[in-house]
Swiss-Prot record:
Keyword Membrane attributed: yes
Species for this entry: His1 virus (isolate Australia/Victoria) (His1V)
Bilayer-spanning residue ranges: 8-28, 42-62, 73-93
Coiled coil feature spans: none
Broad class of the protein's primary localization: host cell
Domain of life: Viruses
Subcellular location as annotated: Host membrane
Keyword field: Host membrane, Membrane, Transmembrane, Transmembrane helix
Protein name: Putative transmembrane protein ORF13
Membrane topology reported for the UniProt record: Multi-pass membrane protein
The keyword Membrane is assigned to this record: yes
InterPro entries assigned to the protein according to its UniProt record, in alphabetical order: DUF5658
Gene Ontology cellular component terms for the protein in this record: host cell membrane; membrane
Length: 99
């Protein structure tokens, strides 16, 4: 099984899409200082470039690990991406529902 697909789907695409949706709504801002700086300086292109760079770096690191351990890199990214997506969705839902 290629664990990178789920990592890209959650952290790469899911986080990016939910962030874009959230930031398009009044009252929602980027809480991550690094991402906020990148967004302010380079916009959406900067976020996508940072994610591509991050995935490239993680891929190199994972490839240098023993083969039996390689799946844990993308699995960790998938868990992180899932949690971030759920957080973003909760923030968006809170704004939409007026909580």
């Amino acid at each position: 099984m290629n664990y990178w697909h789920s990592a890209i789907a959650t952290f790469g695409i899911g986080d990016t899409v939910t962030t874009i949706i959230g930031l398009s709504m009044a009252g929602i801002y980027e809480a991550n200082p690094a991402a906020n700086t990148i967004l302010g300086e380079l916009g959406l292109f900067g976020i996508i470039a940072a994610k591509v760079l991050y995935f490239g770096l993680m891929y190199i690191i994972v490839k240098s690990m023993p083969e039996h351990s390689r799946k844990y890199g993308p699995i960790t990214i998938t868990v992180l991406g899932t949690l971030i997506c759920l957080w973003n969705i909760a923030i968006i839902a809170t704004q939409v529902l007026g909580f």
